[in-house]
Swiss-Prot record:
Transmembrane segments: 25-45, 111-131, 141-161, 176-196, 210-230, 269-289, 304-324, 326-346
Quaternary assembly: Interacts with CtaB.
Entries under PANTHER family matching the protein: CYTOCHROME C OXIDASE ASSEMBLY PROTEIN COX15, CYTOCHROME C OXIDASE ASSEMBLY PROTEIN COX15 HOMOLOG
The EC number(s) this enzyme carries: 1.17.99.9
Entry superkingdom: Bacteria
UniProt key word Kinase: no
Principal cellular location given in the protein's record: membrane
HAMAP family named among the record's database cross-references: HemeA_synth_type2 (MF_01665)
Protein name: Heme A synthase
Catalytic reaction annotation: Fe(II)-heme o + 2 A + H2O = Fe(II)-heme a + 2 AH2
Organism, as annotated: Brucella suis (strain ATCC 23445 / NCTC 10510)
GO biological process assignments: heme A biosynthetic process
Length: 358
């Protein structure tokens, strides 16, 4: 029976105390990875909002760790930036000091991305070799490591879209890059929360499924937010609750074929992001009603109230960001709170299932 339980959780231990200690170590490691991933996404958001994402025009996974160290190297790096359309059409005349400002944002974003790879790979090797990981958990972590490598490639694929013709990166690639980061965050936190001890029994299967769908809905909304960011769609329709005096504006489908508007028309993209925000809030409320009806007074039920509150707060931040035409501080706050909502939704989903078997 004990061997079966150990296989289910994917952790190897000699006795309960060793098993508990191993679970705790792995969980803390995953929390550290989670925190750095949040930092990467936030620095990435600042990089985007300050127009810094194209300041480094080459992808050097190893050598790129070292920034320019003297004036000549800075001039050389600046000259590379001066060859791309963003400089020639938007930032022409930028000083070296101004270039250094945007360079450091992109460099920090890339450095953190490299660091998280190290933070995953080295402890993973240690836990693996010392027998603290077994079975499914090993391969889940290898999958996360591979997904992280893919995310790095997606990041460069995104940057490359803005180096030849466009003056900014493709909104398609930006949204994919952001969403993939959030999928990784979801997976890391989900596994970590499966290693805690819960005092309450798992919820019924229908509640678990609904909780999972809410996580999916939040990820979809984050993808839509990536499209909004890539198209600077937050600078259109800066009114609420009506949209320039209408419930449904008349200029949502001005491009042909019609479906292109959903991805390329800033006004349509913002409209869809708005409407889906209401959908996420409605789903959270319906889920709370479901859980309070089927498991009243439980921790599961109380968590749904917190979830509704977080989604509501995020909606209010989004409205404020919209009304103020997306200033840097509010844009970053909106992005950070999206991650808060995602993390809590993931924690709730995992808790409805209970911990992995000991």
């Amino acid at each position: 029976m004990a061997a079966t339980s150990a296989q289910h959780i994917g952790l190897q231990g000699h006795g309960t105390s060793r098993n508990d200690r191993d679970r705790r170590l792995v969980r803390y490691w995953l929390y550290a990875v989670f925190a750095v991933l949040i930092a990467i996404v936030m620095v990435g958001g600042a990089t985007r909002m300050t127009g810094s994402g194209l300041s480094i025009t080459e992808w050097k996974p190893i050598h790129g760790v070292i920034p320019p160290l003297n004036h000549a190297e800075w001039v050389e790096e600046f000259e590379k930036y001066q060859q791309i359309p963003q400089y020639q059409q938007i930032n022409k005349g930028m000083s070296l000091a101004e270039f250094q400002y945007i360079f450091w944002w992109e460099w920090a974003h890339r450095l953190l991305a490299r660091f998280v790879g190290f933070l995953v790979a080295v402890p993973l090797g240690f836990f693996w070799l010392t027998g603290r990981l077994k079975g499914g958990l090993k391969y889940r972590m290898l999958g996360l490591l591979a997904l992280g490598g893919l995310q790095g490639a997606i990041g460069w694929w995104m940057v490359a879209s803005g180096l030849s013709e466009l003056t900014s990166v493709s909104q398609y690639r930006l949204a994919i890059h952001l969403t993939t980061a959030c999928v990784i965050i979801t997976a890391v936190f989900y596994i970590a929360r499966g290693l805690v001890t819960y005092s309450e029994r798992p919820a019924e299967r229908s509640i678990q499924r609904f909780a999972g769908w809410i996580v999916f809905a939040v990820l979809v909304q984050i993808y839509l937010g990536g499209l909004v960011a890539g198209l600077h769609a937050g600078l259109t329709y800066n009114t609420w609750p009506l949209i320039d005096g209408a419930i449904i504006p008349s200029d949502l489908f001005t491009q042909a074929p019609w479906w292109r508007n959903l991805f390329e028309n800033p006004k349509t993209v913002q409209f869809v992001h708005r409407m889906f925000a209401y959908t996420v809030l409605l789903l959270a409320i319906l889920h709370a009603v479901q859980v309070w009806k089927n498991a009243p007074g439980t921790t599961h039920a109380r968590r749904t109230i917190v979830l509704v509150g977080l989604v509501f707060i995020q909606a209010m931040i989004g409205i404020a960001t919209l009304l103020m035409s997306a200033p840097l501080h509010l844009g970053l706050t909106h992005q950070f709170f999206a991650l808060v909502v995602l993390a809590f939704a993931v924690a709730h989903w995992r808790a409805t299932k209970g911990a992995y078997a000991a």
